[in-house]
């Protein structure tokens, strides 16, 4: 059997591909563990400058693995222990995406459902194809939300709309998801080419500056204006010392495009 996750690092882009299309890339404990291991590998790499998360063969991620849950429920473990065990690994995987230090992009071609929808919006940027669909339809299997929905979804669409999407389990098409801000952009013509064009300035950008900016934006949600400014000033002092800042400033003065190395 093939590995549940494929990891490729090329031209600064680490691409993590969920690779269980026969199971619609569901987040089984095995899949979640493989996601975590792959992210650990990217974190240790000197080559990666951004992380792309996608799914194989036209499916992003169908959410929690119901078959694994049923199997554990029928075993000897207590019900709550079985459920917590599955959710723990899935939640860890989604948290690693949300908290990863490099810019992260979810590349959604096909369905992102339940916990799979959380995996998609946990990324910094979510891009969809004309075939992309997204639903927080936990209700369809008689379950409450989990794996970070209560944190991630209201921050994207607001509290009232988040409740509506959860209560109805509505499957959103790409245009609706883009209108709500769940997808940053939808590329309908040539998804692969347009996706590559979009991420190029991220992959070839000033990596230290971008990851520092990401951290500052995340911190800013829970900070006062003064605290945010102080945090930015402290971080900027570090970025000032990078080779990419020197290159950027030099290129600006010389009237040319900078050639950032991510250092």
Which sequence ranges carry the predicted segments?
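Conserved CoA-thioester-binding segment of acyl-CoA-metabolizing enzymes
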Residues: 1-56, 244
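Short, active-site-adjacent cap segments at secondary-structure transitions
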Residues: 58-62, 112-114, 135, 259
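Hydrophobic alpha-helical segments typical of transmembrane helices
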Residues: 82, 89-93, 149-152, 161, ...
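Crotonase-fold acyl-CoA enzyme core
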Residues: 98-210, 241-242
């Amino acid at each position: 059997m093939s590995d549940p996750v494929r990891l490729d690092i090329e031209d600064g882009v680490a691409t993590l591909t969920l690779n269980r299309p026969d199971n619609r890339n569901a987040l089984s404990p095995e899949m979640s563990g493989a996601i975590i291991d792959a992210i650990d590998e990217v974190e240790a790499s000197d080559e990666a400058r951004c992380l792309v998360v996608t799914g194989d063969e036209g499916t992003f991620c169908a959410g929690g693995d119901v078959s694994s849950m049923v199997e554990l429920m029928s075993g000897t473990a207590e019900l709550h222990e079985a459920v917590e065990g599955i959710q723990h690994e899935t939640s860890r995987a989604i948290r690693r995406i949300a908290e990863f230090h490099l810019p992260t992009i979810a590349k959604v071609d096909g369905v992102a459902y339940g916990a799979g929808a959380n995996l998609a919006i946990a990324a910094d940027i979510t891009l969809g194809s004309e075939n992309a669909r997204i639903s927080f339809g936990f209700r369809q299997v008689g379950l409450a939300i989990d794996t970070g929905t209560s944190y991630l979804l209201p921050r994207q669409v607001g509290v009232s709309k988040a409740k509506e999407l959860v209560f109805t389990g509505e499957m959103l098409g790409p245009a609706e998801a883009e209108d709500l801000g769940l997808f940053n952009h939808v590329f309908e013509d040539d998804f692969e080419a347009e996706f590559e064009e979009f991420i190029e300035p991220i992959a070839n950008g000033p990596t230290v500056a971008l990851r520092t900016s990401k951290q500052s934006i995340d911190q800013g949600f829970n900070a006062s204006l003064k605290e945010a400014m102080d945090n930015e000033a402290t971080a900027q002092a570090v970025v000032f010392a990078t080779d990419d800042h020197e290159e950027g400033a030099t290129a600006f003065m010389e009237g040319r495009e900078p050639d950032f190395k991510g250092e």
